Amino acid sequence: MADDLVEGLTRAGLPGAKASARYVRVSPTKARRVVDLVRGRSVSEALDILRFAPQAASDDVYKVVASAAANAENNHSLDPATLWVGEVYVDEGPTLKRIRPRAQGRAYRIRKRTSHITVVVESREPVSAAGRGAKTTRRAR
């Protein structure tokens, strides 16, 4: 998906940066619950949400979002105040298979799932406070 990130431009054509964490020992479904909280938000707001989210996966997602923001700032000289979480997704990594002994010689298989977390931040102009809640007048029909 985000492999199209060439020379600091996202797929939308905006300047940005990418970071990913691979083989993270958290279930992809649990990580996706956390990722959905921050998609489309500003980086500062996303980091605040992740800092106080009760899910265990929020720590791993926090590190990746912070790393993507640092990549944008250091590698592409982008202003941290204009960064937004543009694209964020979780792919399934390899599954570690373990055995749990059960009664009468049986064994149950335990699947320890891993995830690949990818975050793409992009630089957008901040929305002004007046533009966000401004009312537009409609003509009478």
Curated annotation (Swiss-Prot):
GO terms for molecular function: rRNA binding; structural constituent of ribosome. InterPro entries: Ribosomal_uL22, Ribosomal_uL22_bac/chlpt-type, Ribosomal_uL22_bac/org-type, Ribosomal_uL22_CS, Ribosomal_uL22_sf. GO terms for biological process: translation. Transmembrane segments: none annotated. It holds the Pfam family Ribosomal_L22. The keyword RNA-binding applies. It comes from the Bacteria. One of its GO terms (cellular component) is cytosolic large ribosomal subunit. Keywords: Ribonucleoprotein, Ribosomal protein, RNA-binding, rRNA-binding. PANTHER family: CHLOROPLAST 50S RIBOSOMAL PROTEIN L22-RELATED, LARGE RIBOSOMAL SUBUNIT PROTEIN UL22M. HAMAP family: Ribosomal_uL22_B (MF_01331_B). Part of the 50S ribosomal subunit. Belongs to the universal ribosomal protein uL22 family. This protein binds specifically to 23S rRNA; its binding is stimulated by other ribosomal proteins, e.g. L4, L17, and L20. It is important during the early stages of 50S assembly. It makes multiple contacts with different domains of the 23S rRNA in the assembled 50S subunit and ribosome. The globular domain of the protein is located near the polypeptide exit tunnel on the outside of the subunit, while an extended beta-hairpin is found that lines the wall of the exit tunnel in the center of the 70S ribosome. This is Large ribosomal subunit protein uL22.
